[in-house]
Amino acid sequence: MANMKPNLTDLFRLRERADEGAARRENDRLLGLGSTVPQLLRPVWSGAPTVTGNIIGAIVNRGSAGTELLRTGPATNSGGGRMAAQQHAFGADDAAGVKAALLGSIAPTADALRAQQVLTTQVTVTDMCKPDVEGPGSLMLFFRGVRRLLIKLSAETMVRNDLINELETAFMILNRICGLPPVGTNGINNFEASLVSLNVLAAAAAPHYRNTCEVDALRTFVLAGGKDSKLNEKLTNLDLILQASVESRNFPHSILFPAGALTESVNSTNVACVKMLMNGSVELEGGLTRPCGSFRFPACLFLDLDDTRQCGVVPRGADRADGLFYVYLLFLYSTETWHPSYEIYVAKSALGEAGLQSMLDEKFARRRVNNTVAAAPPAGNFYARGRQREDGDWRCYIEDAYRRASGNNAVNPLEQGARPTDLHISFAGVPDRNSATYAAFCQLGVSLGPWSSACRYTTVQRHGLGLKYVELPGLSLKIGTWRACY
């Protein structure tokens, strides 16, 4: 047996098998079929019904038959030719089946992506927001809760009596300037149906910022672009309303809520219908009247919480140059008795909400202490008031403040109608959260990639003035809720 020579039939069969294998490998390489098809389609049909698996098996078998048909031809007498004659080749029907199966598997994912985008439409007066001037991608805020604020202050016993009158006066003047009914519930309802842009809000708070030069430039830019002779008076009265909310320990974040990024608007003389994106990517949102590919805000309002030069010690891993980062809307408060103030920023951090709150506690510890115990009593300077006492200990003023806050008595007969607003003491004998609140933040969105590539700076020129903007093209908006820091 070992010395037997193979006959011609065996040699022909071996040659035929070698030709078939080489032809199959060559056509698989050219057409991308064969063993590549199951590897590409396996993740798509993972968990699919058995019928789909049978379809894939039939497609693979027909693809192999098609390669044999291309290699040998229908007129050959080889085994590949006979097999191809018995089976159907990979044709248009099979391609249509693959396309339908792929679309059927991708459709739920596409629907889920579309469902993640949330758009809101609001009809608003254009006194405190100019959609045609702000431009797409600008942040808008709902101005809500004015009626609740008035009712709460009327029932509050720890505020100045004049504070309610100042708030009502500023609110009536603002309504009158905006052309709304100055009295009654109609004025409140119309005012609460309005939007406030981030630029207008920051322009109203310009006197309270420490970097007053940059924010004053923003205020001048807003006044020049608003084309409204009464806009300066509107900003002043809006500032008085927000100052009253800080002094009464209700804070602006209780009446201002982020509405989203402006996408498109239909403008009239004093009214506009505004569409805003609350959830989703601004870059992927389509159907816009003007190109809107990024979330934008003034550069003077930007606060980098990952920068050690601005915020001191940064936790390990928070100052990475790569990875994702979060974008927040941040309020900072100073609740001194006669000097209440507030600031608003757009902050960037690599930390989530829980980590950001701990970081803000470290960064603004001095502001937190000053808000707990006011530095300026109603009668004058804190230290001067203490030196006038017989015992000469200025710390006794804190004990007096504790007694006044606990007993709810008047501060001084010479101060008509004055109420102690320097300390709010809880039933446990410690300052409550309202008296110690120094900040509030709300998540706006998240972006992937390093900040250097995800951010770009542009300059907007209007009426001979220029304002620097920060643009975030890849930001995915996800408006959260306010979280107070105290």
Swiss-Prot record:
GO terms for molecular function: DNA binding. GO terms for cellular component: host cell nucleus; viral capsid. GO terms for biological process: viral capsid assembly. It comes from the Viruses. It is found in: Virion; Host nucleus. It holds the Pfam family Herpes_VP19C. Keywords: Capsid protein, Host nucleus, Virion. InterPro entries: Herpes_1 (IPR004999). Belongs to the herpesviridae TRX1 protein family. Interacts with TRX2, MCP and capsid vertex component 2/CVC2. Structural component of the T=16 icosahedral capsid. The capsid is composed of pentamers and hexamers of major capsid protein/MCP, which are linked together by heterotrimers called triplexes. These triplexes are formed by a single molecule of triplex protein 1/TRX1 and two copies of triplex protein 2/TRX2. Additionally, TRX1 is required for efficient transport of TRX2 to the nucleus, which is the site of capsid assembly. This is Triplex capsid protein 1. It comes from Psittacid herpesvirus 1 (isolate Amazon parrot/-/97-0001/1997).
